[in-house]
């Protein structure tokens, strides 16, 4: 064991923030957060588990049946053995098959449009590097949208002219100063603020702590009493609608506003368009059904008196509606955020200090004021003379693309066709955990001629590949990042902590070598003649130039890199007074939105003209395929929420699992009434099933969930036992969820649309194997 005197700390970062990692240069001993926030983030303690995990991919591996006959492989992906090969053998095999498929079927046959959360650095983003290589080789099929916000990304540009989900919010200082009421609607920031797309600046939870102590009226609207509600304790009211009925609840509130003359007609006339069409629906003039509080109560399970009370509270106070993303990850998900904007517009508080709505307070610390900052540039998926994506598919429709090559589909007003995908390369992502209906995915995954996975760990995706390449973790290479997707609060060196484990290589180096195989001089073309540190210096020097325009001076790169310290950017007083939509609301003609009318569109003629029955021209209540209202006897709604101690599937294998696993499986939260009906006790192993599959989970009995709803957090690694009817032993919720698009408009993920049965498990003991590498690896 290393002498403690030889240990030192290295500054680096991950999606969960800057960290100090204790090492002796070969072994990681511990890790902790580098920012003094007073709020513990469990994810920051897991670096040792990431680097030294037994589930690391150690060597290049090829599926046995594929290696024997690449053009006519035998065996089944996910069931075949793996054979260790050298790096040269693996890269030669990839190059040969890539060349064959591209020449035979064209660039659209190659899906390299994956994305994922492996690294937050500006250089070593695996998906970007993959796309850069494929651009050099002549193009590929890319992706549209993402799994997190596919529906919202599609609808919000029509409604307010931008995505909103990835944009800065009205500043937290103004919320704390001016808001009277703050509503968390389908948002659990105590969990989701642990991460960011870059590195977390870790300020959001401090603001929520201040909110807890502010004396304001705080309301959470969610089928589950989340960790955030527990954090606020008796200072927050929990309102629990039936899952998937948020639009009905909002319509009931909106009707109450009109019924009492509380809607702001002047704001609606000046800053919106289409309200009259929506009002005709709201009041029942167009369909004969007035969307009263009583009507809404029958659907959403919240009493009519409470609905009227919410309307009065929202009207009588400066109200900030902080909406999360879970409710738009449902069938007809576009309606949820469209309706919350409509409700905020009816209140007339958009563009005011502390009022309106926000769709990103729960992610990446939205509302933390943007600093005067020297912002890094980053590696691009394009390169000079290359060919970018020749086609793109909605990322959540990859399975349908594989099942139906050439098939017609509609997307965002366009008639499109799925490409004929023959080759998939997934780098830096975990599609087997984030895609719905796992068994359908596994069947479709057999169709391509070649599947390559670049991975640090033996995930389910890696186990279902033909070729698996061992990748470095972020702690085995050098990189740079910013903290705060919106604040740009810090510039952080992500310094290499330990050498690469086993035969792991940087994706940057792998794709550079493949580029040289593709064409003479390809290595130099891919790298542009720069090494890892030279690229980092280039990105840093761009930040220095940008900083100079903001009166922010950075030291020379060599000095910065040697210092092993982050740089905090200066505060910007203007950002601390930032109000989203303030300029527009003050003068809509001078500052129009980027919508068709220049105003907030409560009714969109463009969307109406598309004629989509699943996304009409204004927000509406549409009944999902699977919900409480059409459940069969004893079926329960399945809520797939963000986990507390993982980033989606990342760290599922780590020691953090000891903090949440029940019966050595993913926990499922069950209301006592539902548990009692089924003879289930706390800690029991239970079976959940529907027509799509079955899983085992560990029972957690809690009053903190709506009766008729069960919650299983997304991200557990699939662990299907083919000797036991394919039951997932680890509790991967997407075995149960329905793979259907949110609508023709967005084609977003609808992972919160599922019903399942539940019972106490009385079958044979099934050993967990999710985190075991293949026998030959």
From Swiss-Prot:
GO biological process: anaerobic respiration
Documented EC number(s): 1.-.-.-, 1.8.4.13
Listed transmembrane segments: none
Misc. comment: Requires a small thioredoxin-like protein for activity.
Similarity comment: Belongs to the prokaryotic molybdopterin-containing oxidoreductase family.
Domain notes: The N-terminal 39 residues are essential for activity.
Protein's job: This enzyme may serve as a scavenger, allowing the cell to utilize biotin sulfoxide as a biotin source. It reduces a spontaneous oxidation product of biotin, D-biotin D-sulfoxide (BSO or BDS), back to biotin. Also exhibits methionine-(S)-sulfoxide (Met-S-SO) reductase activity, acting specifically on the (S) enantiomer in the free, but not the protein-bound form. It thus plays a role in assimilation of oxidized methionines.
Official protein name in the record: Biotin sulfoxide reductase
Organism: Escherichia coli (strain K12)
Gene this protein is translated from: bisC
């Amino acid at each position: 064991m290393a002498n403690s005197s030889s240990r030192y700390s290295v500054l680096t970062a991950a999606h969960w923030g800057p960290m100090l990692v204790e090492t002796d240069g070969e072994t990681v001993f511990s890790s902790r957060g580098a920012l003094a926030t007073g709020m513990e983030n469990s994810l920051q303690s897991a670096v040792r588990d990431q680097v030294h995990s037994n589930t690391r991919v150690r060597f290049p591996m090829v599926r046995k049946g594929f290696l024997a006959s690449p053009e006519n492989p035998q065996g089944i992906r996910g069931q075949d053995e793996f054979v260790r090969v050298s790096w040269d053998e693996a890269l030669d095999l990839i190059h040969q098959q890539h060349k064959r498929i591209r020449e035979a079927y064209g660039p659209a046959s190659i899906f390299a449009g994956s994305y994922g959360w492996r690294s937050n650095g500006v250089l070593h983003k695996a998906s970007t590097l993959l796309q850069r290589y494929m651009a050099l080789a002549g193009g590929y099929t890319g992706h549209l949208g993402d799994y997190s916000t596919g529906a919202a990304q599609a609808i919000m540009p029509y409604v307010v002219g931008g995505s909103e989900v990835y944009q800065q919010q009205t500043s937290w200082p103004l919320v704390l100063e001016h808001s009277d009421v703050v509503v968390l609607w389908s948002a659990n920031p105590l969990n989701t603020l642990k991460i960011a797309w870059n590195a977390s600046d870790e300020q959001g939870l401090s603001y929520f702590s201040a909110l807890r102590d502010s004396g304001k009226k705080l309301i959470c609207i969610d089928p589950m009493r989340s960790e955030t509600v527990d954090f606020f304790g008796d200072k927050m009211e929990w309102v629990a609608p039936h899952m998937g009925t948020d639009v009905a609840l909002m319509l009931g509130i909106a009707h109450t506003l009109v019924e009492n003359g509380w809607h702001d007609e002047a704001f609606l006339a000046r800053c919106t368009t289409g309200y009259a069409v929506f009002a005709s629906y709201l009041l029942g003039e167009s369909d004969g059904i007035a969307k009263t509080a009583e009507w809404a109560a029958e659907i959403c399970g919240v009493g009519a008196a409470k609905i009227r009370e919410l309307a009065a509270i929202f009207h009588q106070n400066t109200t900030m509606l902080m909406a999360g993303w879970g409710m738009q990850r449902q069938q007809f998900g576009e309606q949820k955020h469209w309706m919350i904007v409509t409700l905020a517009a009816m209140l007339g508080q958009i563009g005011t200090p502390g009022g309106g709505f926000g769709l990103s307070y729960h992610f990446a610390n939205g509302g933390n004021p943007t600093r005067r900052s020297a912002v890094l540039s980053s590696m691009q998926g394009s390169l000079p003379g290359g060919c970018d994506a020749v086609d793109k598919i909605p990322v959540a429709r990859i399975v349908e693309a594989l099942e139906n090559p050439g098939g017609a589909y509609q997307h965002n007003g366009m008639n499109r066709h799925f490409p004929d995908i023959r080759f998939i390369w997934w780098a830096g992502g975990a599609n087997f955990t984030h895609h719905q209906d796992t068994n359908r995915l596994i069947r479709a995954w057999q169709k391509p001629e070649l599947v390559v996975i670049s991975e640090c760990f033996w995930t389910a995706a890696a186990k279902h590949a033909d070729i698996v390449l061992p990748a470095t973790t972020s702690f085995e290479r050098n990189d740079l990042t910013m903290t705060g997707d919106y604040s740009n609060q810090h510039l952080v060196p992500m310094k290499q902590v330990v050498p690469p484990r086993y035969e792991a290589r940087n994706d940057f180096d792998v794709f550079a070598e493949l580029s040289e195989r593709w064409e003479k001089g390809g290595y130099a073309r891919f790298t542009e003649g720069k090494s890892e540190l030279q690229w980092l210096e280039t990105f840093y020097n761009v930040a220095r130039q940008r900083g100079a325009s903001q009166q922010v001076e950075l030291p020379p790169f060599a000095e910065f890199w040697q210092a092993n310290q982050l740089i905090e950017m200066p505060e910007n007083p203007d950002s601390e007074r930032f109000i989203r939509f303030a300029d527009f609301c003050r003068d809509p003609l001078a500052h129009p939105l980027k919508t068709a009318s220049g105003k907030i569109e409560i009714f969109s003629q463009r969307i109406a003209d598309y004629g989509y029955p699943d996304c009409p021209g204004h927000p509406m209540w549409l009944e999902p395929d699977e919900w409480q209202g059409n459940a069969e006897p004893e079926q329960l709604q399945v809520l797939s929420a963000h986990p507390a101690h993982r980033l989606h599937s990342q760290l599922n294998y780590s020691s953090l699992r000891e903090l949440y696993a029940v019966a050595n499986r993913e926990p499922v939260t069950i209301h006592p009434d539902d548990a009692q009906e089924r003879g289930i006790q706390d800690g029991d192993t239970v079976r959940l099933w529907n027509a799509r599959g079955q899983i085992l989970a560990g029972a957690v009995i809690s009053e903190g969930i709506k009766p008729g709803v069960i919650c299983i957090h997304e991200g557990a690694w699939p662990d299907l036992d083919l000797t036991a009817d394919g039951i997932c032993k680890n509790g991967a919720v997407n075995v149960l969820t329905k793979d259907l698009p949110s609508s023709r408009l967005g084609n977003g993920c609808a992972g919160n649309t599922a019903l399942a049965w539940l019972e106490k498990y009385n079958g044979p003991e099934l050993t967990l194997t999710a985190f075991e590498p293949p026998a030959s690896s």
